Every structure is written in C-alpha cells, then in structure tokens.
Regions:
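Nucleotidyltransferase catalytic core that binds NTPs
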Residues: 2-248
Length: 248
C-alpha cells in the first residue's frame, strides 16, 4: 500500500520540527495524536479520526518518564514498537515520532508546565507529579509539531480538561479535540494497562462502569443528595468489585 511506503519514523525533535514546518508552508492541515504506545482499539479510533480530518497525521509514541512517580510502572509499562508502528502505517499515519527520553529532556531540564487548579484533585491526589509531566511533554510536542489540531481520548477526562485549560491559558494555537471512549464488549474501556489485571480482576472491572451508570440513574430519577449517591455506589462496588480499592 502506498501509505505504508510513505510513513516516516522520526526520532529527533529537529527532524519532526522540520517535516511539520514544511507541511505548514504548503498550507496543509496537520493532526497530532499523542500516545504512549501499546495500541488498542481506542488508539486506533483516534488515529482514524485524525486521518479523516487532516491532510497529514503525526502520531507520537513516547513513554514519558516525567509523568510517572516513584514506585509507578515506568519500567513495566507495556511496549511493542513493531506492532504499534505497523498499526500506524495501516491506519495511514504520515509520521510516527518515537523519541528517546534524552531527545525530549536535557540532563539539566528544569522547566515545568502545571495547571494546579485542575490537577490537584481526583487522579492527581495520589499522583502529585503526573499532570505536571503530562502538560510539559504535551506542550513540547505542540511546539515541535505545531499541529492544526491534537486528538485525545475522553477516557482520561481529567487529562483532557487540563490540556484544554493549558492551551487556553497559554494561547497555544492548537485545537484540542476529545474523542469518545472505546469499550470492549462487556463495557470495560480499552486501556494499555488492562494487561495488568488478573482474570478475576478483569471479570469484575466492568462493574466500575455499571456503578457509574447506577449513579447517573439515581440522579436522573431525582436524587440530589450527593452523599447518598456516593454511598449507593460504594455499596454496589463493595458487593460486585471485592478485588477493587477506592482511589477517589
């Protein structure tokens, strides 16, 4: 296929910037899909959407070390570059940008981008440096590629809200597009980290979505006491998700 022959794999920031600058000079619309790899149907939907709305598609594949805290899964995070690059080719990506950490962070790197008002809650409570790392690397990618739009999944809703706020506050000329969650047949959202689940945990995981649907049903039915809704959800999860532990 022609698109398989023309996809470029780029490792250096300078090369990415050069290629994207030439596309801009040609007046082409470009879309960036930032990822950490180990692709599944959710990633495929983002790349396919980008392909449908842009002249050129850049997919970044970078397991960003600065968004992992101590004792998190940086080294264990699943990776399969050959499979991932083949999928990007198949879906019509024009560039796969796969830098090494030293390409993105100098040894004396000391500058960070943060949105504390949105980051210091929910997922950020237990991962205090996570969103700082996300914002910093995403802004780096935006500056290198300078895309017309960037595509993110709605599965990581807090991340999406933070990136939109960063772009708004800093007047970054990039349209941030959120795309719907893609789920497996039983309702569990596709995630690269689902491979960590034991068979028992995997069987119970869809109950999280069911508990949220129950909460939405209570609210739609007129319940306005948040404490009662939370209590009902906790009771449901205690019964149906005994292997789980509440984070937030």
């Amino acid at each position: 296929m022609e698109m398989e022959k023309t996809m470029q794999i780029i490792h250096s920031p300078e090369a990415l910037h050069s290629v994207c600058a030439e596309w801009r000079r040609q007046g082409l619309k470009t879309a960036l899909v930032p990822t950490m790899g180990y692709y599944h149907a959710g990633h495929a939907s983002l790349i396919s959407y980008a392909r449908s709305v842009a002249d050129k598609v850049i997919v970044s594949l970078f397991v960003n070390p600065t968004q992992f805290g101590p004792n998190e899964d940086l080294e264990a995070y699943p990776r399969d570059f050959e499979k991932d690059s083949a999928l990007v080719r198949e879906l019509g990506g024009d560039v796969l940008y796969a830098p090494e950490p030293e390409n993105m962070y100098a040894p004396d790197h000391a500058t960070w981008v943060e949105v504390p008002a949105l980051a210091n809650t929910l997922c950020g409570l237990s991962r205090p440096i996570h969103f700082r790392g996300v914002c910093t690397v995403v802004l780096k990618l935006f500056m290198l590629a300078q895309p017309s739009l960037a595509v993110f999944g709605e599965k990581d809703w807090q991340q999406l809200a933070i990136i939109k706020k960063m772009v708004s506050d800093l007047n970054v000329p990039v349209e941030v597009v959120g795309r719907p969650i893609v789920r497996e047949a039983d309702g569990l959202a596709f995630s690269s980290r689902n491979v960590y689940l034991t068979p028992e945990e995997r069987a119970q995981a869809p109950q999280i979505r069911k508990s949220l649907e129950m909460a939405a049903g209570l609210a739609a039915g007129g319940e306005r006491d948040a404490a009662r809704i939370i209590e009902a959800v906790r009771g449901y999860l205690a019964e149906h998700l005994p292997t789980g532990e509440e984070d937030y």
